[in-house]
C-alpha cells in the first residue's frame, strides 16, 4: 500500500498560478495516464468501501467521474453522475451551496437513486468539503443514504476533513494527503 501511495504522490503535478495567480493547482492527470497508479487508486478506494453494501457510486463532475465509474464497477454498483447546473437533460434535483466568494449548483437526475439505497460519493480532490456536502444533500433528496466519501487527494490546509467531521455517512478515505 505504501508503494501505491508513493507512486500517486510522485505523479501529482503542481501547476503554479492556475486557475489564477497565487494558486498552486494539484494536477492528477499524470496519475490517470499511468496504468499502475490509476489501477491502485481505483482498487484502493473500492477495497476500502467493499464491506459497506454500496448500491451506487456518485461521481462529481468532472474528474470525479474518471475515478468513480471504475470504483462502481469494482464494487458491482451503479454509477450516478452529479453535474453542474444545466448539464443534465430531463428532470433533476438541484442543490445550491456557498463557495468562498460565490455560489455553485449541483444537479442529479430525479430517478438516479431510490429510497434506501446506500451510496458512496467519489471525487478527485477533497478541498473545503462544500462539494462533498452538497452531493450528500442531493443523495438525501432522493432518499438515499451516504456511506462514505472517497478521493485521490486531500488538501488538508483547506479544512474539508474538519467540515465533514461528525457528518453521518461521510467517513473520508483520501489516498494522499497534502
Q: Where in the sequence are the language-model features?
A:
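PRPP-associated nucleotide enzymes
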Residues: 1-178
Amino acid at each position: 500500500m505504501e508503494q501505491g501511495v508513493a507512486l500517486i504522490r510522485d505523479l501529482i503535478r503542481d501547476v503554479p498560478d492556475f486557475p489564477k495567480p497565487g494558486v498552486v493547482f494539484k494536477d492528477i492527470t499524470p496519475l490517470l495516464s499511468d496504468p499502475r497508479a490509476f489501477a491502485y487508486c481505483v482498487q484502493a478506494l473500492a477495497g476500502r468501501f467493499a464491506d459497506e453494501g454500496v448500491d451506487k457510486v456518485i461521481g462529481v463532475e468532472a474528474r470525479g467521474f474518471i475515478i468513480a465509474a471504475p470504483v462502481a464497477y469494482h464494487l458491482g454498483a451503479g454509477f450516478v453522475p452529479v453535474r453542474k447546473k444545466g448539464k443534465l437533460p430531463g428532470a433533476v434535483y438541484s442543490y445550491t451551496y456557498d463557495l468562498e466568494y460565490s455560489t455553485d449548483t449541483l444537479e442529479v437526475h430525479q430517478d438516479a437513486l431510490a429510497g434506501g439505497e446506500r451510496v458512496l460519493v467519489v471525487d478527485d480532490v477533497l478541498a473545503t468539503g462544500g462539494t462533498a456536502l452538497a452531493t450528500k444533500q442531493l443523495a438525501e433528496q432522493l432518499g438515499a443514504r451516504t456511506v462514505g466519501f472517497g478521493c485521490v487527494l486531500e488538501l488538508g490546509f483547506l479544512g474539508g476533513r474538519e467540515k465533514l467531521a461528525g457528518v453521518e455517512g461521510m467517513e473520508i478515505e483520501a489516498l494522499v494527503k497534502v
